[in-house]
Amino acid sequence: MHSLNQKIKAFSRDNLRKQCTRVTTLTGKKLIETWEDATVHVVETEPSGGGGCGYVQDLTLDLQVGVIKPWLLLGSQDAAHDLELLRKHKVTHILNVAYGVENAFLSEFTYKTISILDVPETNILSYFPECFEFIEQAKLKDGVVLVHCNAGVSRAAAIVIGFLMSSEEATFTTALSLVKEARPSICPNPGFMEQLRTYQVGKESNGGDKVPAEDTTHGL
């Protein structure tokens, strides 16, 4: 008993090995959770980071490109940073709706960058006009446009679904099905899904393509 008491008194939290938990969210984000001073710290992994806990290199590449139309593609930042893959798909335009992802080949392609946060509170509808205009411009020039975000499952998918609802007069259900067939991993966050349903209601009630009045500001 005396020996046990000594060990308890000598115990120090500093002697514990630092633990970290890797978490992949429904939207495809990879996070690192660490404990420090009885508090959980969450950090998003950096593709170019080191091997330490908190910033780790993600070596898993997602190079699957969803071909929605011959001129409309959907993918991740990995696809957008693979020059050989882009040339294979004859990409001419790239719509980057990621947050904090740089455009890799400025001299090779026509870029449009719109930083969108992948959280349910973000007003995705307010970005539709600018995104749709860029896609239409690429189409009119007989180009091929790749729409991408970080993981290519939430933000970019929501933009493409909305575009099909706008330009192809597709219903939300039909557009979602078409995009999921081309890229099975898509999973727009719950807020985006609800806004896309609202977008359909607005189109039906307005008889056109207007964003509902309450959704015209950028929400975070």
Curated annotation (Swiss-Prot):
Protein name: Dual specificity protein phosphatase 19
Species the sequence originates in: Mus musculus
Function description: Has a dual specificity toward Ser/Thr and Tyr-containing proteins.
Tyrosine-protein phosphatase domain residues: 64-205
Family indicated by similarity: Belongs to the protein-tyrosine phosphatase family. Non-receptor class dual specificity subfamily.
Regulation: Phosphatase activity is enhanced by Ca(2+) and Mn(2+).
PANTHER family xrefs: DUAL SPECIFICITY PROTEIN PHOSPHATASE 19
Example of a GO biological process term: positive regulation of MAPK cascade
SUPFAM superfamilies found in the cross-reference section: (Phosphotyrosine protein) phosphatases II
Catalysed reaction equations from the record: O-phospho-L-tyrosyl-[protein] + H2O = L-tyrosyl-[protein] + phosphate; O-phospho-L-seryl-[protein] + H2O = L-seryl-[protein] + phosphate; O-phospho-L-threonyl-[protein] + H2O = L-threonyl-[protein] + phosphate
InterPro entries: Dual-sp_phosphatase_cat-dom (IPR000340), Prot-tyrosine_phosphatase-like (IPR029021), Tyr_Pase_dom (IPR000387), TYR_PHOSPHATASE_DUAL_dom (IPR020422)
GO MF terms held by the record: JUN kinase phosphatase activity; MAP-kinase scaffold activity; mitogen-activated protein kinase kinase binding; mitogen-activated protein kinase kinase kinase binding; protein kinase activator activity; protein kinase inhibitor activity; protein serine/threonine phosphatase activity; protein tyrosine phosphatase activity
Pfam families recorded: DSPc (PF00782)
Domain of life of the source: Eukaryota
EC number annotated for this UniProt entry: 3.1.3.16, 3.1.3.48
Enzyme active site: C149 (phosphocysteine intermediate)
